[in-house]
């Protein structure tokens, strides 16, 4: 699924694309951390789009989506550090330890480097440190998975918004397909914010 070397997306030269015109008429830009991992061209495109979007006053959401098959933890962290000053809504970046100075992290998939199933207090502390370091953030959200078996999981979400950390109830369900779960969470959050839903 990550065999994207030498794909049209990875190899394309975006330097001739008028990003300002491309974003005309839009209020919101959502980007994924998978795109910049594909090639230097793609990482430059993402940073350029972030800058142009903020210049045009768009709301920007960013989902870190770290994939160890695409780039290293250090590469991902360095890139996301450049992105965060332009981001309003943040998803999927906690594994990078971007709220900390030290470089402690696990090998391989760094999702193992932070609590996979944090308490409310742990999550609130992480959110607060993020906001102190990146005061431009308006919302931070993550979902937490509890795997009971290969076919049954539970999910809940945490969100920091307007100075408060919120925790959802726990939902247990039978899995039909694991593909796109994080994207579904992101799209649901974006829809809710566009329609002024209350945090809970």
Task: Give the ranges of each region predicted by the language model.
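Conserved N-terminal subdomain of the carbohydrate kinase-like
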Residues: 1-36, 60
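Active-site beta-loop-alpha junctions enriched in small/polar residues
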Residues: 5, 34, 65-69, 95, ...
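Short, small-residue-enriched loops and turns at beta-alpha junctions
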Residues: 8-10, 37-38, 67-71, 147-150
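Catalytic-core regions built around general acid/base machinery
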Residues: 44-57, 79-86
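A short helix->loop->beta-strand "cap" motif at the edges of active sites that frequently abuts
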Residues: 52-59, 134-138
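Hydrophobic faces of well-ordered beta-strands that scaffold small-molecule active sites
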Residues: 60-62, 90
